[in-house]
Amino acid sequence: MGKEKVHINIVVIGHVDSGKSTTTGHLIYKLGGIDKRVIERFEKEAAEMNKRSFKYAWVLDKLKAERERGITIDIALWKFETSKYYCTVIDAPGHRDFIKNMITGTSQADCAVLIIDSTTGGFEAGISKDGQTREHALLAFTLGVKQMICCCNKMDATTPKYSKGRYEEIVKEVSSYLKKVGYNPDKIPFVPISGFEGDNMIERSTNLDWYKGPTLLDALDNINEPKRPSDKPLRLPLQDVYKIGGIGIVPVGRVETGVVKPGMLVTFAPTGLTTEVKSVEMHHEALTEALPGDNVGFNVKNVAVKDLKRGFVASNSKDDPAKEAANFTSQVIIMNHPGQIGNGYAPVLDCHTSHIAVKFAELITKIDRRSGKEIEKEPKFLKNGDAGMVKMIPTKPMVVETFAEYPPLGRFAVRDMRQTVAVGVIKSVEKKDPTGAKVTKAAAKKK
């Protein structure tokens, strides 16, 4: 068993009928961790319901249905392997929480797989102003998904079938759009596939012998290995805080950057409470250190439950410790707000694990969301489809960072009226020093 394969997260994006479920289902079916017995059960049910046509999509439909009914699906079902990577498919965008998940960073994707419907009419619907192809691509780029693979799907249903001309037309148009969003199309493989028939998914297809590039599986294998940010200073947003008899207080969260280890002095922002880490554990096993991506619990000394809350951020006291944000400037894209957003708007921001109302104190500029260039200074308002720079002031103590330095703490969703009305990334933060920050006895000894 040579070296462990690297884990990567893939997000599958594209218009509603582009064939995302079929394509993803196909990969999971052929390369994945779905038990053959489960597949046979699904196949039998599909046949009984005359659902032959849904060959692979129903694999996902069943998984989704079981998940939504609260049957916990073994997450291994959403995984598949290439020769180089273990791939996890994180929520495909049909899911209403997808945008929120993508932003709050429960799932940072390393690569986006954009599925395009190549059929007559299908492609045009997806790429049109109202189509989701553009919005998903823009979101992926804004949220820092640097790598992309583009699949020209349904090649078995073009006119004529497997049409090279149609493929070239699509590559040209999608490239020009992706370039406007900010991607470099020369670095994006455009793979003609049929998620349904299986052409160029895993094996090279004779139906598409004019195409000399990689299959989808090859393209996934060629993804650049993501750099995990373990060399950055520690940032660990708290998800929960437990009091465990005989042990004490155990904050729990995911290491986003840096490392945490026993004996380390940590400072919790926004309050500035400083203490020593006694032990770190993951899945009930003690660790000598936890790395980015690890969900851990760690035991801290001389701390009361009331001192820590979800949304607080643990950091290394001696290496750029996290602090409360007095205010910050963000680039936001308004996605679905029925009216106009002006100065004084105060929605809730979901950023890492915090969920805090923030005031839009000042609309600084309106920018062209395609080119990123400034269109207007101090606009009176922003409306659907607009992008702008906004100065924001939290209504309660909050910890955020710039997207450039600490990506998971620098992107957010703006929630209002029970939906995501905007998304954004933080460009700069003005921090304030904590007043009367408590240093525990254990920490004072270590200093």
UniProtKB/Swiss-Prot annotation:
Positions of the UniProt region annotated as G4: 153-156
Region listing for G1, in residue ranges: 14-21
InterPro entries (UniProt xref): EFTu-like_2, G_TR_CS, GTP-eEF1A_C, P-loop_NTPase, T_Tr_GTP-bd_dom, TRAFAC_GTPase_members, Transl_B-barrel_sf, Transl_elong_EF1A/Init_IF2_C
Compartments it resides in: Cytoplasm
GO CC, one annotated term: cytoplasm
Domain tr-type G: 5-230
Residues bearing the modification 5-glutamyl glycerylphosphorylethanolamine: 289, 362
Region (G3): 91-94
The keyword Protein biosynthesis appears for this protein: yes
Segments for region (G2): 70-74
GO MF annotation: an example: GTP binding
Keywords from the named record: Cytoplasm, Elongation factor, GTP-binding, Methylation, Nucleotide-binding, Phosphoprotein, Protein biosynthesis
Modified sites of kind N6,N6-dimethyllysine: 55
Ribosomal protein listed as a keyword: no
Region of interest (G5), ranges: 194-196
Residues with the N6-methyllysine modification: 261
N6,N6,N6-trimethyllysine: residues carrying this PTM: 79, 187, 306, 396
Cited SUPFAM superfamilies: EF-Tu/eEF-1alpha/eIF2-gamma C-terminal domain, P-loop containing nucleoside triphosphate hydrolases, Translation proteins
Positions bound to GTP: 14-21, 91-95, 153-156
Task performed by this protein: This protein promotes the GTP-dependent binding of aminoacyl-tRNA to the A-site of ribosomes during protein biosynthesis.
Entry's family note: Belongs to the TRAFAC class translation factor GTPase superfamily. Classic translation factor GTPase family. EF-Tu/EF-1A subfamily.
Alphabetized HAMAP family for the sequence: EF_Tu_A
Record protein name field: Elongation factor 1-alpha
Organism annotation: Vicia faba (Broad bean)
